[in-house]
């Protein structure tokens, strides 16, 4: 693996993205959201199941941070192509909410991560689980990192998940080879974890939309940056094209906002993630797991227990659908930028199955040169 001296982001290269980002240009610009990572990188050479090499991890998202009592997190879910997993979505589709952390990892570690999150919730919300009949249905999503990681060795342990959850904080985030995105691949370059945000105004009220992606999708020929067909200018070192000739990856998109939205509205927001990733070129592959979740931190109400007195109902504030165009624009813009942030921050990584290839991090100078050919780069001040 080749390290870079500094973690640049796509905007640092002069790419002229639309929209206004928040302070951190991250999902943590949404007040209350906390993110934690566990990153596992160990070993070199061809895969030996159970021994390594290990290049994987866990990303933990706490939509309302660490609280003594959970509350419903209103949400909507959408699959563009469902060759993947996101647990907890049956209930989200049914009831419109969840109350767990969200974790993202590799495909073969979903069970361990789910197990660990249940334990964390029982400890974190002790009174709820000890004094009432609460049940935990964590949201755990995945993408496949078996080309760079001994995925069948299942190296993510309970302690790694707990570390990511307990380490979750607000503020700026790491990107690229970090957390669940450690071993991921995007457009046959090294990919990983990326984030971005947008600030919008609706009837003079300010709102924030933030996204986090675990980016592991795309074939080189489709790779597009702000409308520029970059992949057509960059055919070399495209490992999947050489080995399989088709896309085999996935992407998880998590959208968080403080906009007051109903679950059915959040599902509509989640659907727009397809347009955001589509702007980077992908048509959505047959073998891809493109799974999206949108949640809001608004309309914070108490989670009723089975043994407590039930409220007659809740009073929710929500945005008029006629104001949604600006929301959709912001979501699409932030997702496009988050994917590119993952790629720009990533570091090159060798493969383990098959061994002997290198997944190159995208070369910043070459990307800038291609963008300049199309007059799609900001002039340096």
Predicted regions and their residues:
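Alpha/propeptide regions of enzymes that mature by internal proteolysis
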Residues: 1-381
